[in-house]
């Protein structure tokens, strides 16, 4: 009995040893029915890199000698397509793709069209509908058209931005081009050197790199809007001062275009982020600051509670300079408001405000 058990253990050990020492071939072999089923060696190390309206597929081929072709297949919810490539090919660029996530399948084929096990991966190309493309900096954050001048405020020079330039029609009718750069975009406000025909479009063109995109992206041209826009704090000031009956501003915040274009004197009694809204007023001659705020001497000297402030003096000083050049604007400043403004000849200190005399009648 012991001899039989010993023989059985030796036999099992020998079988196990044979199984363990058998090679696990890349061409996979199985037994089924009366014979061996031979699987074709599949591709490995499948990766995909997104590009502009394309996906770049890379893989490692199997050394199986019976491989004749490599099949690359791509599909989304709408379309399916594929291509057969010569043995040894290790990369393929799938072009003309839409804004969609694609399933990429790579497999090996022998001369009879028998196919290996598949290797699958998913990826999405960059297109004009991609959220990273849509949110990419347009460089020009806000623009104003004053007479024949384009005045720009910038959002900065985003990482990845390669080029940005404007195309427009000059005042004399010829075509104009102006290249923006990081130095210009770092300025708080900038006046285009060329005078332009403001009735014609001004388009912004950009190229750049985004995220993992392998290609230089040429973004769709963007037309600068000529619709006047006002800052939120200036609109709040107008609502407080004039109400929202629509003559100057309505309840939704739309400022009357005719009011802004024809205004010659603006009385401003409020803290404000910047004076950029004045660029929407091509006929403004006088900016009167603090005239309607009555303070004691102590109140006027109180920097915290008694003095209106401009929180962005860099933009505001440049705006006043531009307006003075174009409309002859003069600033009349009462008490000690807007001390952040520069010491310019067109900024006149008017001293303290005085309560108006009121005639009283006995009834």
Please report, for each region that a protein language model flagged, where it lies by residue.
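Bacterial N-terminal signal peptides that target proteins for export
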Residues: 1-9
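C-terminal motif of bacterial Sec signal peptides marking the signal peptidase cleavage site
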Residues: 17-20
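Pro/Thr/Ser/Gly-rich low-complexity, intrinsically disordered linker/stalk tracts
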Residues: 22-65, 115-159, 213-228
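Solvent-exposed loop/turn segments flanking beta-strands in beta-repeat/beta-sandwich domains
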Residues: 52-80, 151-178
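Short beta-strand segments within Ig-like beta-sandwich modules, predominantly Fibronectin type-III
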Residues: 81-88, 178-185
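Beta-strand-rich modules
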Residues: 92-122, 189-219
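Compositionally biased low-complexity segments at domain edges in trafficked proteins
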Residues: 132-167, 231-258
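Concave beta-strand-loop units of leucine-rich repeat
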Residues: 246-363
């Amino acid at each position: 009995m012991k001899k039989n058990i010993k023989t059985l253990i030796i036999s099992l050990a020998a079988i196990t040893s044979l199984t363990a020492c058998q090679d696990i071939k890349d061409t996979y072999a199985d037994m089924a029915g009366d014979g061996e089923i031979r699987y074709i060696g599949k591709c490995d190390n499948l990766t995909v890199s997104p590009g502009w309206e394309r996906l770049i597929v890379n893989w490692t081929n199997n050394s199986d000698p019976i491989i004749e072709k490599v099949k690359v297949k791509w599909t989304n919810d709408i379309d399916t397509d594929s291509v057969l490539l010569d043995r040894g090919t290790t990369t393929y660029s799938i072009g003309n793709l839409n804004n969609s996530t694609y399933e990429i399948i790579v497999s090996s084929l022998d001369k009879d069209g028998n196919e290996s096990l598949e290797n699958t991966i998913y990826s999405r190309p960059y297109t004009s509908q991609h959220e990273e493309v849509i949110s990419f900096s347009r460089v020009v954050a806000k623009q104003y058209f004053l007479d024949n001048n384009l005045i720009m405020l910038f959002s900065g020079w985003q990482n990845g931005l390669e080029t940005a330039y404007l195309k427009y029609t000059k005042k004399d009718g010829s075509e104009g081009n102006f290249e923006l750069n990081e130095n210009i975009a770092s300025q708080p406000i900038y006046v285009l050197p060329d005078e332009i025909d403001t009735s014609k479009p001004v388009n912004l063109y950009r190229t750049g790199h985004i995220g993992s995109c392998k290609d230089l992206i040429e973004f769709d041209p963007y037309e600068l809007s000529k619709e006047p826009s006002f800052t939120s704090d200036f609109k709040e000031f107008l609502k407080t001062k004039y109400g929202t009956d629509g003559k100057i501003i309505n309840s939704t915040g739309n400022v009357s275009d005719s009011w802004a274009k024809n205004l010659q004197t603006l009385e401003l009694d409020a803290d404000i982020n910047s004076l950029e809204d004045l660029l929407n007023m091509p006929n403004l001659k006088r900016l009167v600051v603090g005239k309607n705020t009555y303070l004691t001497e102590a109140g006027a000297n109180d920097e915290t509670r008694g003095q209106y402030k401009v929180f962005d003096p860099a933009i505001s000083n440049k705006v006043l300079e531009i307006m003075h050049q174009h409309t002859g604007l003069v600033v009349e400043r009462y008490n000690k408001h807007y001390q952040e403004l520069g010491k310019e000849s067109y900024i006149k200190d008017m001293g303290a405000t005085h309560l108006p005399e009121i005639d009283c009648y006995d009834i």
